[in-house]
Amino acid sequence: MGKIIGIDLGTTNSCVSVMENGKAKVIENAEGARTTPSIIAYANDGEILVGQSAKRQAVTNPHNTLYAVKRLIGRKFDEEVVQKDIKMVPYKIAKADNGDAWVEVNGNKMSAPQISAEVLKKMKKTAEDYLGETVTEAVITVPAYFNDSQRQATKDAGRIAGLDVKRIINEPTAAALAYGMDKAKGDHTVIVYDLGGGTFDVSVIEIAEVDGEHQFEVLATNGDTFLGGEDFDIRLIDYLVDEFKKESGMNLKGDPLAMQRLKEAAEKAKIELSSSMSTDVNLPYITADATGPKHLNVKISRAKLEALVEDLVQRTIEPCRIALKDAGIDVGSINDVILVGGQTRMPLVQQKVTEFFGKEARKDVNPDEAVAMGAAIQGAVLAGDVKDVLLLDVSPLTLGIETMGGVMTALIEKNTTIPTKKSQVFSTADDNQGAVTIHVLQGERKQAAQNKSLGKFDLAEIPPAPRGVPQIEVTFDIDANGILHVGAKDKATGKEQKITIKANSGLSDEEIQQMIRDAEANADADAKFAELAGARNQGDALVHSTRKMVADAGDKVTAEEKAAIEAAVVALEAAVKGDDKAAIEAKIEELSKVSAPVAQKMYAEQGQPADGAAQQAEPEAKHDDVVDAEFEEVKDQK
């Protein structure tokens, strides 16, 4: 069996590693570099250039040179973040027939996984040249906060590149693996702060030693999938454009060639300012007008760069705070802070991290290489070559289904260790309901409509039965790649439906962050909504059971009793449509009171103790683990 390689498929740069003699080794590419720019170019003669060669010709071929494509992977064209990206890049981002964000080169539309596959092919070839054998299997890393569709799309890219992706693992977790292999004995908790080219992640990871085996358990993860070094570059580019405009009156934003030169210069200046206090951006012949050629020469200090990007660095701190809270630990419990991603070389980033965590970050882990090395270690674990490492990763967001009253019922809570499988039994909302629709949701809010819809599917041919009687078992199964599979089974007939949540639009970074912020800010509102939904469900159940009881009682109910009960039922139905929980509860009590004598007659006749409304409020609740679910009836298409 061949080696399983580890690939860090980055927004800006990619890296490949393999296990040799018990250690992860980063493999140099054909140009002799340990990392490869994640840049793909389509030359006029049809040649596809990848890496450094693509980067070198970007200035003369801006429209056909693709970079930061990872920011589009698994996303819809109409998403706000994609629309923002369109304004920033010189190449064309187009809308695919399925609504995804694709790129267009020379009139040909291509998907983000297709483009990413070119980088993966280069990584595969780099490993094959070094190992002298064909490579078919890989572990590929993704940002911890990548959603289901982004993970699926990354796996697709691997398949397009001719790789069997054995596992998708989170970048911070991979970095912790690379770091933890050489650690001293004993248990310790680490923070992995990963600020790369296009994404930011933070993970709280516990490394425990159990019977000589290193166990890596992710306690919590958080992040922003649209914040990274590219955003820092954009701030610097905008500043340079403004300075040139002040001096010459010309706007470079309409000139793709000039903007490509500026992008290169800004990235170079940003890197230089990590070790120097100031630098010059000098671009002769940047453009020309009727008076002749124009030159750009701007001096930038480290302080100026820090002022331009300070809010971006500050944006990384709140996810750190949330991750610690979710992990249930305080800053004092952290043993080490690991910095991953090239952008963490910036002194301001290091300073803010040190201030927040109260300790200096470790400098002995190469921020550009740690992720690929961790992926190679995980590859060796899967191949059975490394036996003393166990990796326990987590699902970053809560997953559940929509149930009665528009509530999201969670099956898998956020930060649950994966792989995992959870089942819960639900039932029908109407008598003789022949089909149910399972609506799968992802997010942190109590109201179903406030969360992201991942998909719907139907379970049909349910035998006719009163509401609450059928038992529909819904199962959520997250595999080791963090990809979700959902099934629904009618326990009476054994009929089953399953879906894998396919690579649809998934969640945008703004939605994910907003969900968690909203969930915290609106905790009280969510609790009130949950109570109101509970009261509505109780009212609906009482209306249904009371009407059934009156029908069953027949002539044992007097006309006066029937009229009083009907009036109370109508009043409760009206209250249930409103938003006043107290009013619903008052009408429930009223209906319970007027229907109690009839209930007593019925139970007395059957020789059972009468307990009025308490007995008849939910006569069909035969199963404690059955939850009323709001399922839609599906009509057969004739």
UniProtKB/Swiss-Prot annotation:
Region (Disordered): 602-638
Comp. bias (Basic and acidic residues): 619-638
Biased composition (Low complexity): 604-618
InterPro entries registered for this protein in UniProt: ATPase_NBD (IPR043129), Chaperone_DnaK (IPR012725), Heat_shock_70_CS (IPR018181), HSP70_C_sf (IPR029048), HSP70_peptide-bd_sf (IPR029047), Hsp_70_fam (IPR013126)
Residues modified as Phosphothreonine: 199
Function, as annotated: Acts as a chaperone.
Protein's name in the database: Chaperone protein DnaK
Source species: Pseudomonas fluorescens (strain SBW25)
